[in-house]
Amino acid sequence: MIKPSKLYAQLLTSRIRTIPFRDFERLLRAFGFEHDRTRGSHQVWTHPTINRPLSIQPSDKDAKRYQIEQFLELVEQHGLYMSE
């Protein structure tokens, strides 16, 4: 397992967007997202300051690239920061 701060830095500097799903969940929590509910393989995560849920699901054991991109866009658009 990689620290959320190091993982986030790697995502910002690397074009590779494949990370283990469990690490992605840890990264979401580090930015203040909370797991709201699960339907089938889809998990819905919410943030107290954002009025838009983020739906994620694993692709095998990794997070899906487009969902990582959506997360990074939300962080940038809403000025979210990590709390460790």
Which residues are covered by each model-predicted region?
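Preference for short coil/turn "hinge" residues that link or interrupt alpha-helices
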Residues: 4, 12-14, 47-49, 56-59, ...
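A charge-rich, low-complexity, intrinsically flexible signal that marks solvent-exposed coils, linkers
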Residues: 1-22, 26, 30
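Short alpha-helical segments used as structural interaction elements across diverse proteins
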Residues: 12, 34-36, 61-62
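C-terminal structural segments of small proteins and small subunits
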Residues: 59-84
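Short, well-ordered coil↔helix boundary/capping segments
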Residues: 18, 39, 62-65
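A short, structured beta-strand/loop element
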Residues: 27-57
